[in-house]
Curated annotation (Swiss-Prot):
Signals that turn on the gene: Is up-regulated when the bacterium is grown on t4LHyp or t3LHyp as sole carbon source.
Name of this protein: Trans-3-hydroxy-L-proline dehydratase
UniProt catalytic activity: trans-3-hydroxy-L-proline = 1-pyrroline-2-carboxylate + H2O; trans-4-hydroxy-L-proline = cis-4-hydroxy-D-proline
Active-site positions on this chain: 90 (proton acceptor)
GO function terms (MF aspect): 4-hydroxyproline epimerase activity; trans-L-3-hydroxyproline dehydratase activity
InterPro entries xrefs: Pro_racemase_fam (IPR008794)
Similarity field: Belongs to the proline racemase family.
EC number: 4.2.1.77, 5.1.1.8
UniProt entry keywords in alphabetical sequence: Isomerase, Lyase
UniProt superkingdom: Bacteria
Chain's role: Catalyzes the dehydration of trans-3-hydroxy-L-proline (t3LHyp) to Delta(1)-pyrroline-2-carboxylate (Pyr2C). Can also catalyze the epimerization of trans-4-hydroxy-L-proline (t4LHyp) to cis-4-hydroxy-D-proline (c4DHyp), albeit with 30-fold lower efficiency. Is likely involved in both degradation pathways that convert t3LHyp to L-proline and t4LHyp to alpha-ketoglutarate, which would allow A.tumefaciens to grow on t3LHyp or t4LHyp as a sole carbon source. Displays no proline racemase activity.
Residues annotated to bind substrate: 91-92, 252, 257-258
Length: 342
């Protein structure tokens, strides 16, 4: 067995969404900040292609690179690589990273709770993990400040006509549509159509509405479309279905932590969710994330919330991705039969 490159990975998922973690074999990319390092990875694409493309990856996989933190108080830092984006933050990936750090013994576990400060490309996030018998059983992440951008905006989508949408930021950027109004009951068998239409809606929103982050001029696009289910009030708090279409055309298996944060920001802006209340989002496979509004703040001149999200993660395996020098596809390949719903 020979290899000119060996990347060491601990595989994990958070409530169904794959979020592998690179723990060795890759040196930190250049950059004075974690954000600058993530921009290098996005531009260079060598590592992204190696781990995300076939034959090592696929459209179903996200991969996180552990790097030394830049902030002196941070316990660890990570860069998120999604199928088409290298985003500021990800809820499911932060849960996967936290699970790997603790269950993998990289950060010492304290029972019944372990507290960590992680540095994501978009900023610092506080993590609290409920731990028992050597397992991080539930991860709580204080996400980046989240805000509603546009409410009840009109969006023309070819073949769908005029839609009423909200746009928001929850650590990543979303266009949000009413699932019921689009004819969806958020069942597993609707996944392909949700993915297909979601990408069309996202692309239309990028052309017609645009997105800008008041404090991050590099982030100027919508990444995802959230199909938002009806909010119900229960004894345990608010509850709603959620399905997020991810570029180039797949549905998140988890409820998507950044989407949950974005939706809470929209509900708060409408006066439909208060500080201290919780919203449980339910994915197409029935998994859940629970969000809570911890407080309020501003992002630039925009009112924002301080969201907390929580969910569970599990390690699924350990892998060594290798590259034989005779392999004619050192960065892999992708084909449209799987790379994008059509």
């Amino acid at each position: 067995m020979r290899s000119i490159k060996t990347v060491h990975v601990i595989s994990a998922h958070a409530e169904g969404e794959v979020g592998d973690v690179i723990v060795g074999g890759v040196k930190p990319p250049p950059g004075e900040t974690i954000w600058e390092q993530s921009r290098f990875i996005a531009r260079d694409e060598t590592l992204r292609n190696f781990v995300l493309n076939e034959p090592r990856g696929g459209v179903f996989r996200h991969v996180n690179l552990l790097v030394p933190p830049k902030h002196p108080d941070a316990d660890a830092a990570f860069i998120i690589m999604e199928p088409e984006d290298t985003p500021p933050m990800s809820g499911s990936n932060s849960i996967c990273v936290s699970t790997v750090l603790l269950d993998g013994g990289i950060v010492p576990m304290q029972e019944p709770e372990t507290h960590m400060l992680l540095e994501a490309p978009g900023g610092l996030v506080k993590v609290r993990a409920e731990c028992r018998n050597g397992k991080a059983e539930r991860i709580f992440v204080q996400n980046l400040p989240s805000f509603a951008a546009k409410l009840d905006a009109e969006l023309e989508v070819e073949g769908l006509g005029k839609l009423k949408v909200d746009t928001a930021y929850g650590g990543d950027s979303f266009v949000i549509v009413d699932a019921e109004a689009m004819g969806f009951s958020l069942k597993p068998e609707e996944a392909h159509e949700i993915a297909r239409l979601g990408v069309r809606i996202t692309n239309a929103a990028n052309k017609a509405l645009g997105f800008d982050h008041p404090e991050n001029p590099d982030w100027r696009h919508f990444s995802f479309c959230l199909f938002a289910g009806k909010v119900e009030r229960t004894a345990e708090g608010l509850r709603a279905g959620a399905a997020v279409a991810i570029q180039p055309g797949k549905v998140d298996r988890s409820p998507t932590g950044t989407a949950l944060s974005a939706r809470m920001a929209v509900l708060h802006a409408r006066g439909e969710m208060k500080e201290g209340e919780t919203l449980t989002a339910v994915s197409l496979i029935g998994s859940t994330f629970t969000g809570r509004i911890l407080g309020t703040t501003t992002v630039g001149d925009r009112p924002a919330i301080l969201p907390e999200i929580s969910g569970r993660g599990w390690i699924t395996g350990i892998h060594q991705h290798m590259l034989d020098p005779s392999d004619p596809w050192p960065e892999g390949y992708r084909l449209t039969d799987t790379w994008g719903a059509r």
